[in-house]
């Protein structure tokens, strides 16, 4: 006889509502999202060509959220320009240098959603 655990079902259902900022170590992060915030800050400071690639990664992350994230928001950035968005990533990375770019980007989206 199979007995459903109502508390377990509730717990699993509630996991679907975890914000993007609460990322588990099991998230599949591809490409530039794996670099550390320390590297992000260093490359932005040195005007390294990698900074443009990493900026494009963050913009792609935001675009993907706009496409596949919670609706009805069309543009979570609210039309902010790239420099404003990157300044917010800079701020997060200065405060959390051990985070990766994915976590900083997820935190930015969470902040923009509020």
Model regions: which residues?
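Intrinsically disordered, low-complexity cationic segments
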Residues: 1-2, 95
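Secreted/extracellular small peptides and ectodomain modules produced from precursors
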Residues: 10-11, 35, 91
């Amino acid at each position: 006889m199979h007995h459903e655990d109502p508390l377990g079902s509730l717990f699993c259902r509630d996991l679907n509502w975890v914000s993007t900022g609460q990322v588990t170590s099991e998230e599949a992060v591809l490409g530039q999202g794996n670099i550390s915030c320390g590297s992000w800050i260093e490359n932005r400071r040195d005007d390294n060509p990698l900074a443009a690639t990493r900026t494009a990664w963050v913009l792609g992350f935001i675009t993907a959220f706009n496409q596949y994230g919670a609706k009805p928001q069309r543009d979570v950035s609210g039309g902010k320009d790239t420099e404003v968005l990157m300044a917010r990533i800079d701020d997060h990375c200065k405060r959390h240098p051990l985070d990766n770019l994915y976590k900083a980007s997820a935190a930015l989206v969470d902040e923009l959603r509020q």
